[in-house]
């Protein structure tokens, strides 16, 4: 029973020492414990010199290891470059903010994608978006600026030329009796017949738009600039799609062709609508007393 009680006492003392050391008592607490003798304790319950030396050695090793750990942390902090503050998303463009959110979602995802092929397809797209974001908005050079000015000038000249012909044509179609000289020629009489209006108008539009596009292609070859590459975002975004992601070859080229056809159709529909409005106004004011 005496051995059991001595073992229990040693265990209790050891636990007390550990608690005091964990609370930061340090060597002062150890010195206080070793120098004082409890009044009610027997001689066998005192701490031996071997245990004291072991405890002091462990404390010294712990303090040395803590100091070395702090030195390593200081070295790593000195070696790491300073982190620049990230630019807030509010100051960036909406497209750039969306791209940054996509990149963060891809980098912060801890679970791997279920389909690795899909991830492989989207990775080139995100890389190209990141390259565009890093490069910023394309800088319009002097040659591109001159080309865009020439294209706008060409559109203005063609618009004036078309309506310089269309307005008299609409007037004489709506009022064929005002010009008797038109009946001297069978060709002019055929052109000015109201029932032939849409056929003549469509033929004129096809000819004028063809001339416009021929001159536009000549300007693009001379200046070596594609007009849609700098004026349409659809062409820019189609160029970012990597090959093989969609079952369409040369997606950017097909988008350019589709935009050309849409431009032709929009020009035709715009002129037709304005012609109908002009015809209605001429008929109304000519019929008024």
Curated annotation (Swiss-Prot):
<keyword id="KW-0812">Transmembrane</keyword>
<keyword id="KW-0333">Golgi apparatus</keyword>
<comment type="function">
    <text>Required for the post-translational delivery of tail-anchored (TA) proteins to the endoplasmic reticulum. Together with GET1, acts as a membrane receptor for soluble GET3, which recognizes and selectively binds the transmembrane domain of TA proteins in the cytosol. The GET complex cooperates with the HDEL receptor ERD2 to mediate the ATP-dependent retrieval of resident ER proteins that contain a C-terminal H-D-E-L retention signal from the Golgi to the ER.</text>
</comment>
<dbReference type="GO" id="GO:0000423">
    <property type="term" value="P:mitophagy"/>
</dbReference>
<feature type="compositionally biased region" description="Basic residues">
    <location>
        <begin position="11"/>
        <end position="21"/>
    </location>
</feature>
<feature type="transmembrane region" description="Helical">
    <location>
        <begin position="154"/>
        <end position="173"/>
    </location>
</feature>
<dbReference type="Pfam" id="PF08690">
    <property type="entry name" value="GET2"/>
</dbReference>
<dbReference type="GO" id="GO:0005789">
    <property type="term" value="C:endoplasmic reticulum membrane"/>
</dbReference>
<protein>
    <recommendedName>
        <fullName>Golgi to ER traffic protein 2</fullName>
    </recommendedName>
</protein>
<feature type="compositionally biased region" description="Basic and acidic residues">
    <location>
        <begin position="1"/>
        <end position="10"/>
    </location>
</feature>
<keyword id="KW-0256">Endoplasmic reticulum</keyword>
<feature type="topological domain" description="Lumenal">
    <location>
        <begin position="174"/>
        <end position="196"/>
    </location>
</feature>
<dbReference type="GO" id="GO:0043495">
    <property type="term" value="F:protein-membrane adaptor activity"/>
</dbReference>
<keyword id="KW-0931">ER-Golgi transport</keyword>
<comment type="similarity">
    <text>Belongs to the GET2 family.</text>
</comment>
<keyword id="KW-0813">Transport</keyword>
<dbReference type="GO" id="GO:0008320">
    <property type="term" value="F:protein transmembrane transporter activity"/>
</dbReference>
<keyword id="KW-0472">Membrane</keyword>
<dbReference type="GO" id="GO:0000139">
    <property type="term" value="C:Golgi membrane"/>
</dbReference>
<feature type="topological domain" description="Cytoplasmic">
    <location>
        <begin position="217"/>
        <end position="263"/>
    </location>
</feature>
<keyword id="KW-1133">Transmembrane helix</keyword>
<feature type="topological domain" description="Lumenal">
    <location>
        <begin position="285"/>
        <end position="289"/>
    </location>
</feature>
<feature type="topological domain" description="Cytoplasmic">
    <location>
        <begin position="1"/>
        <end position="153"/>
    </location>
</feature>
<dbReference type="GO" id="GO:0006890">
    <property type="term" value="P:retrograde vesicle-mediated transport, Golgi to endoplasmic reticulum"/>
</dbReference>
<feature type="transmembrane region" description="Helical">
    <location>
        <begin position="197"/>
        <end position="216"/>
    </location>
</feature>
<feature type="compositionally biased region" description="Polar residues">
    <location>
        <begin position="33"/>
        <end position="68"/>
    </location>
</feature>
<feature type="region of interest" description="Disordered">
    <location>
        <begin position="1"/>
        <end position="68"/>
    </location>
</feature>
<dbReference type="InterPro" id="IPR014802">
    <property type="entry name" value="GET2"/>
</dbReference>
<dbReference type="InterPro" id="IPR028143">
    <property type="entry name" value="Get2/sif1"/>
</dbReference>
<dbReference type="GO" id="GO:0097051">
    <property type="term" value="P:establishment of protein localization to endoplasmic reticulum membrane"/>
</dbReference>
<comment type="subunit">
    <text>Component of the Golgi to ER traffic (GET) complex, which is composed of GET1, GET2 and GET3. Within the complex, GET1 and GET2 form a heterotetramer which is stabilized by phosphatidylinositol binding and which binds to the GET3 homodimer.</text>
</comment>
<dbReference type="GO" id="GO:0071816">
    <property type="term" value="P:tail-anchored membrane protein insertion into ER membrane"/>
</dbReference>
<dbReference type="GO" id="GO:0032977">
    <property type="term" value="F:membrane insertase activity"/>
</dbReference>
<feature type="transmembrane region" description="Helical">
    <location>
        <begin position="264"/>
        <end position="284"/>
    </location>
</feature>
<dbReference type="GO" id="GO:0043529">
    <property type="term" value="C:GET complex"/>
</dbReference>
């Amino acid at each position: 029973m005496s051995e059991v009680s001595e073992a229990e006492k040693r265990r209790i003392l050891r636990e007390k020492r550990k608690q005091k050391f964990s609370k930061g008592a340090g060597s002062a607490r150890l010195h206080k414990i070793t120098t004082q003798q409890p009044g009610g304790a027997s001689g066998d319950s005192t701490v031996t010199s071997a245990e004291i030396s072991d405890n002091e050695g462990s404390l010294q090793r712990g303090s040395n290891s803590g100091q070395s750990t702090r030195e390593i942390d200081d070295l790593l902090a000195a070696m790491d470059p300073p982190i620049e503050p990230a630019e807030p998303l509010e100051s960036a463009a909406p497209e750039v903010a969306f791209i940054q959110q996509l990149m963060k979602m891809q980098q912060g995802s801890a679970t791997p994608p279920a389909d690795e092929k899909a991830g492989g397809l989207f990775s080139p797209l995100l890389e190209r978006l990141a390259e565009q974001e890093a490069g910023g908005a394309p800088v319009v050079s002097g040659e591109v600026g001159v080309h865009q000015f020439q294209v706008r000038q060409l559109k203005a000249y063609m618009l004036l030329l078309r309506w310089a012909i269309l307005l008299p044509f609409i007037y004489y179609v709506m009022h064929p009796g005002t010009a008797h000289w038109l009946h001297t020629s069978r060709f002019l009489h055929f052109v000015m017949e109201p029932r032939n209006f849409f056929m003549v108008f469509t033929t004129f539009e096809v000819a004028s738009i063809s001339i416009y596009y021929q001159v536009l292609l000549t300007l693009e070859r001379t200046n070596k600039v594609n007009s849609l590459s700098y004026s349409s975002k659809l062409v820019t975004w189609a160029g970012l799609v990597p090959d093989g992601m969609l079952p369409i070859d040369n997606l950017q080229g097909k988008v350019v062709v589709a935009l050309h056809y849409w431009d032709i159709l929009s020009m035709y529909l715009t002129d037709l609508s304005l012609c109908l409005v002009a015809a209605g106004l001429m008929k109304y004011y000519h019929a008024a007393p």
